[in-house]
Amino acid sequence: MQIKKNIAISESGYIFNPSSGESFSINPTGVEIFNFIKEGKTYEEIEQLVLEKYNTDKDTFDKDYHDFIGFLKQYHLLDYGEKEN
Amino acid sequence: MEKQRYERPVIKKLETNMPNKYGLRTEYRPMTHIDGVEVTQLIQDHGSPLFVISEQTIRRVYREAKKAFATRYPKVQFAWSYKTNYLDAVCHVFHQEGSWAEVVSGFEYDKAIRNGVDGSKIIFNGPDKTEMDLEKAIKNESLIHMDHLDELYSVIELATKLNKKPKVAIRVNMDTGIYPMWDRFGFNYENGQAWDALNKIMRSEKLELIGLHCHIGTFMLSASAYSAAAYKLADLALGVKKKYNHDIKYIDMGGGFASKNTLKGSYLPGSDVNPTFDDFAEAITSALINSNFEPDNLPLLILETGRALIDEAGYLLGTVISNKRSSLGKRTTIVDIGVNILFTSFWYDHKVTPAQPFTQYTEDTTIYGPLCMNIDVIRDSISLPLMNKGDHFVIHHVGAYNMTQWMQFITLRPKVVMIDANSNVHVIRKGETIDRITEFEAIPKHLEGFEL
């Protein structure tokens, strides 16, 4: 699972999909996770990074992460290539 | 190093020119304190959910209302509408401010007496007054506002029996140009019922006709309707003066003033568009002053407004139980406040403010209560800042009707606390316990014991 290569994201969380013309806004936690996925980090790595930085727990993060990924899928921002997991 | 506050990741598609029912973000700052007391501390000490009443706010709003009328009219008296919130502590604040009591049942009447209100300063409204209630009211020289002819005949009979001259008024209903017209209470002005009742009272010579009363509706968004009502009551009062040379001592305009809540379906927030006390006062007092009363012999103006005086002083604190998605992907948040304690969520889009810091990101959300019932919806559609499980929030303007119309249903009713001017917290109603509920029940002998 990867972020599609042509998707652009700004530091403030503005996302543009040039192939569809759609744009999105994500919050700072979303930007971090989005970039982690873009960098090819695994779920376990992302989880560890988030738990180190934020005052939350595994269960909450697990639920929120999959909810977030669900929306990235729905908005066609993900690419399922060789690295699909 | 201290960890940062977690906010769940969210992504929102940016769409232009797409109006929706969720509206825009309304919350910009968390409500961490109420009258100097920390919200999280209140919940820690008294549990969640928790009703909080601000004594200062009651007094401030009451004084604003009083000022709006007293600066326009020489004789003004407020009477606290017990049904709106009859917690004793709340009633005491209003009585300390000078309000009489306005009650609509024997239960409320007894509550006012127990609170120490002099019988002659209790206005007794409503269609259901038992003979026992009426006898008590007559003996205490309370102001009996009659709703129907059966009651009028009962009062005449009791006057003879007790050899007393009860102080009475009639409730008048009328067309004030609003919809729906409330015509179920009292005697109609336009079709002559009101005059019929007044003639019966005056001809009986057993009753002292002391006032005229109306209550034209609820959550009135038009002040001008009160002007029409005041003119019609003035017309009746002047007619009685002309016909029987009898002075009507007071005109009671009832209540029904809108509070600052936002009605469901309203495009703009109630705090911006609902009429103010000045608007209502201007409409009512102008009508009375411009009618043909002699300037030095104006009747006392009584007001029974409840909702507009107490709504703002009431807060309901709660906690997030869970964040979910609906089948269509819509965000839903479950909280520990149900419609059984927030009855007014059927009428209003209540303002909800998180009690801890949040960012500018929101999600279009439906807020559900904790009851296992489909009707338990606190907000259908709200652009809500992101809150985590266990976070607290404050629901605003819940002071009217929720603490009288609430139900013990599925769960127990919570505590009510009042914060005084010095930020001291007082429990004014204890939380319910299972023993308190079951002490009213009994199990017949043959139902005792079973095997499963």
How would you label these PLM feature ranges?
Chain A
Residues 25-85:
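Long, charge-rich, low-complexity alpha-helical segments
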Residues 1-31, 35, 81:
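Acidic, low-complexity/disordered tracts enriched in E/D and polar residues
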